[in-house]
């Protein structure tokens, strides 16, 4: 399994789209970080140095979750799109092991991207705050938990994208479906008077994991993470079943 994961990571590193997604993810985090630093203390925004403000800074990398979702789809569908999956199955006939290796690879990639975003955020934010005479307490229990769930969101979203891509098997369709669901679909469900259902959808689970205190009725953070993992399994199991029976070139 270790060799399979290493091979999948090597494939991922050699694709230019991967690095484009890394750049987009960091760009989103930096833009939101800049907005938070600029707007702190205005209107209803917490002042710099407060726990609420520092919390908003720490969750900035999590705003690129949909980019990480797309990265997971890329891991699942890259070989299908380029018609190289047949060679992979010749080397490793156990297709379930290949799917598991891709799932682990997506998780590692998502974790790495979340960690990179969080690191870049801290490297920029802490010196900037210090230069402006603001001392941010980033080591209290609440903020440590926020940092941890920001890290956890990356692998969960990447594995969710992987499972979706493995089930749909078409890269473009999987990306469009994933983005439409999070950007439009869940909002439509809420607009239809089914707001009670929102906490149990993937987006609601993500907000619960991020400890979004602005939205009422969300699950606890641990339950949100567990619910996201349940969605991963719910998509991965039928994807595995179909993969066992699929004809590949």
Where in this protein do the model-derived segments appear?
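Transmembrane helix boundary and interhelical loop/hinge segments in multi-pass membrane proteins
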Residues: 70-91, 96
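Aromatic- and glycine-rich beta-strand/loop motifs that create alpha-glucan
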Residues: 1-26, 169
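Helix-capping/transition residues at the boundaries of transmembrane alpha-helices
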Residues: 11, 77, 88-90, 161, ...
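Transmembrane helix segments
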Residues: 31-34, 171-207
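Secretory targeting signals
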Residues: 18-74, 99-168, 207-230, 234
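Membrane-helix interface segments
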Residues: 17, 94-96, 170-172
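Junction motif at the cytosolic side of a transmembrane helix
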Residues: 227-249
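Transmembrane alpha-helices and adjacent helix-loop boundaries
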Residues: 76-81, 114, 156-158, 171-172, ...
